[in-house]
Amino acid sequence: MTNKHGTLSIDSDNLFPIIKKWLYSDHDIFYRELISNGCDAITKLKKLDMIGEYTLPADYKAKIQVIVNPEEKTLKFIDNGLGMTAEEVEEYINQVAFSGATDFVEKYKDKSDADQIIGHFGLGFYSAFMVADEVTIDTLSYKEGATAVHWASDGGTEFDMSDGTKEGVGTEITLFLNEDCLEFANEYRAREVIEKYCSFMPTEIYLSKANAPEEYETIDKEDKLDTDTVVEEIHEEAKTEEKENENGEKEVVEVSPAKDKLKIVKRPVPLNDTQPLWTKSPSECTDEDYKAFYRKVFMDYKEPLFWIHLNMDYPFNLKGILYFPKINTEYDSIEGTIKLYNNQVFIADNIKEVIPEFLMHLKGVIDCPDLPLNVSRSALQNDGFVKKISEYITKKVADKLIGMCKTEKEAYEKYWDDISPFIKYGCLKDTKFCDKMNDYILFKDINDKYQTLPELLVPVEDEKKETDDSKADDAATEESKTDDAAEEKEPERSTIYYVTDKVQQGQYIKMFKEQNMNAVILDHNIDTSFITQLEQRNEHYQFKRIDADVTDALKSDDTADLTEETTTLSDLFKKTLNNDKLTVKVESLKDADVASILTLSEQGRRMQDMMKMYAAGGMGGMDPNMFAADQTLTLNANNALVKYLFENKDGEHASMFAEQLYDLAMLSNQPLSADAMSKFVKRSNEIMLLLTK
């Protein structure tokens, strides 16, 4: 061909400066773009071989080579794919690739940082000019009679094409790096970037340093490959030792046989895994395979709890593995990492437009070749196809969890404490996920047993039925009067009691256990929001903290009138505590050891907790105490101390005992303030001194 000098486009003067400016923090994507192009060329050549339009050499081995040369400030990308003719260079490099880069810029220029093209995908060959002052291409097409082509451009508006000297089929791209980007000619930096973007590309990628000294390794002679370069043959004599036999005589024994070995030029090792675990059938993978892959990809040496292997071909192609990581404490970060791939090419982490938000707390990889990539984030949000992908992933996660609950209940319970925050967060964020998981959410009770919501409600309903049956005779006489009223009355909600602190609420737990009553443990930050949502979605039950009221089951059957005691002690406590808003009741409780119980209204306490959470999160503006929960102090008429206080209400120490009973009740509910605790300790000492007199 004759030498050709041409112009890329009359509008190209500002193209490369714009690309450099916008992608300043992501210059390294040129590695991904150029290696991806090489992979595509190799894949196409293999397809031509499969359909009989080209015959690959018998010793053909697909590979991409990356050669760094810090001395010459160059970087080479070499593939043995299908190569290009002069006409194809003209078409694909000067027109199609350039047009693609121009389209990329057009899409970028009106986008905010939050709405950029995901992974900056689509820039292609011209991404090289982000780091290079000059780029050359040397290529030879697979087509019979094709001649080598050389192409060069300095990143401006002009290019030169001429006959080349390349001998093997494929393409070699050379980047002459600019002074600001010499880091990319560093072998360690190159390795880092290739492993970031290309760890699982389907073609083997080899990295080497130009003019590096030869490295060698020693192998057994029988392990020699045809591709090995032998430097030296080595014969190792058999190793022997003198040992004493069973007769006590010494003899020479062969410890290891003679070996023939070879010193060879060190075999190159690819940087990537061309068949990552997610591309395989789940039946081909062992537990150790999944764990090893997790350690390799996420550098997390705590074993994952379990995983989900996604494998779908219709109506879209999607493969991947999602891991449930182990979280040691509530305060551990539960931020996960979901890596998105396209045909084994890394695109980006945590693309919330594709991956449901609540799944971001997991760790995993998802490969979806059908995903539209050269679009903005906002376009993805409104893409019906992408929504189907998101819904499919959510469904598979729910199916896995439900399957475990049904068939591996013991394992499900074992993992529950770790996965419950994730599942509850998912229920808060995704209605469909919540609908599927509703009956498979576990609640750990005060007896350390795990139950689902339906299982929890059965005893509650049975208890309610017993109470109803015991009153059946009395109710029958009133049946005709109450039928109409019952129809109008809203159905009564079953109450599920819960504990937020087993130590703090220990007195209440003891009372519940003595009466064979149960309560569940809800001690995570997310639980308040979660149970509120459950109540909103279901009118048949409600949650109450164990200290929200004194349930009838804790009261004795004594029907004595306690009006006088209530009035007397209420006046005493309100006056002593200087708290007119405090409600004081006197009840006959079954446990005579309990003197006083402080209960807080469920609604008021939840509002107070929410205000505290907002304040802790920096969302100030409201005083958390403005929604102070209504307090009720219940005094036990069967307790000796309460009886004494009633009988000696005007006594010298009545106020001291009243304050002490209140603080003791408060301690079973929540920590005392510093000032209140100081007074409590001082008062306790005074009471003990009284006992010594």
Where are the predicted features?
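GHKL (Bergerat-fold) ATPase N-terminal catalytic module, capturing the glycine-rich phosphate-binding loop
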Residues: 1-185, 192, 199, 215-222, ...
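GHKL/Bergerat-fold ATPase module in large chromosome/replication-associated machines
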Residues: 117, 135-158, 178-181, 188-693
